[in-house]
Amino acid sequence: MECLDLLFRRVSIRKFTQDDVDDEILMKILEAGNAAPSAGNLQARDFVVIRNPETKKRLAMAALKQMFIAEAPVVIVVCANYPRSMRVYGERGRLYAEQDATAAIENILLAVTALNLGAVWVGAFDEEQVSEILELPEYVRPMAIIPIGHPAENPSPRNRYPVSMLTHFEKW
């Protein structure tokens, strides 16, 4: 698949079939996440993979009761790992860790699309609850919950602002 076709084909999927995502496919998705750009190549991001139905339900409740999270066969929580970046960049490393994590999130979403699966970037959640549920160390911040599965819907791409409205040349 052409790269640009993939970018424009990606949509948010919130309805999944009950078909599982096998471990080999999951590893490809995680490897794609890890291939994302990274400040200083410090890769200040970590992935928590959840298949346990009860844990997925608790995550859904912590994410404003977005129950489609619990219905996905697998969920990846992408986390920023602050010390991994701060050891080189100091306090600014916090921002770089968050950038590393968000770059990985987009790679994961694109890999999912390339593999004919579906996913959605969930950013609306209670960070403290998610951290507690997943027993995250205090120096790690959950950045996104990504439910992944075989799509049970085929939504149309969402409308976007015209690029001309968002683009500034030479200055604002």
From Swiss-Prot:
Pfam families: Nitroreductase (PF00881). Gene3D superfamilies: NADH Oxidase (3.40.109.10). Disulfide bonds: none annotated. Its cofactor is FMN. Its EC number is 1.-.-.-. Keywords: Flavoprotein, FMN, NAD, Oxidoreductase. GO terms for molecular function: oxidoreductase activity. Belongs to the nitroreductase family. PANTHER family: NAD(P)H NITROREDUCTASE YDGI-RELATED, NADH DEHYDROGENASE_NAD(P)H NITROREDUCTASE XCC3605-RELATED. This is Putative NADH dehydrogenase/NAD(P)H nitroreductase AF_0226. It comes from Archaeoglobus fulgidus (strain ATCC 49558 / DSM 4304 / JCM 9628 / NBRC 100126 / VC-16). The lineage of its organism: Archaea, Methanobacteriati, Methanobacteriota, Archaeoglobi, Archaeoglobales.
